[in-house]
Amino acid sequence: MSVAYKPEGYTSVAPYLVVDGAVRTINFLARVFDATELRRYPTPDGRILHAEVRIGDTVVMVADGNAGWPPIGAHVHVYVPDVDATYERALSAGAMSVQAPVKKDDADRRGGVKDAGGTTWWISTMQA
């Protein structure tokens, strides 16, 4: 019997977001993308050392920044069934608009928002 090299149900690549306000980011992901929290390791002062949430078929890892690992903005792309509804949920959850959903030169209708933790979320629905 061989030992698995990764947890069951995890993809080989997972975004790791180091943010300012990990709890706020986790709550945003739950509200906007229906993320399910899998793990949370808080520090004694309530910050998040490490957390994992599942969005669709992907695990996203989240942690609060610190002196050794400062928060850094990232861009993450997420496919959703309804880009317009998800974009509006993100704005209602406090995100700032980067780009309203629009169809350009590829098969996707895509919009972008930036959350309070500094992550830019590109939200798309394929419209072949």
Feature-to-residue mapping (PLM):
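Core segments of cupin and vicinal oxygen chelate
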Residues: P7-G9, Y16-V59
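Vicinal oxygen chelate
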Residues: M1-E8, L49, M61-A63, V78, ...
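Alpha-helical macromolecular-interaction surfaces
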Residues: R24, D84-A85
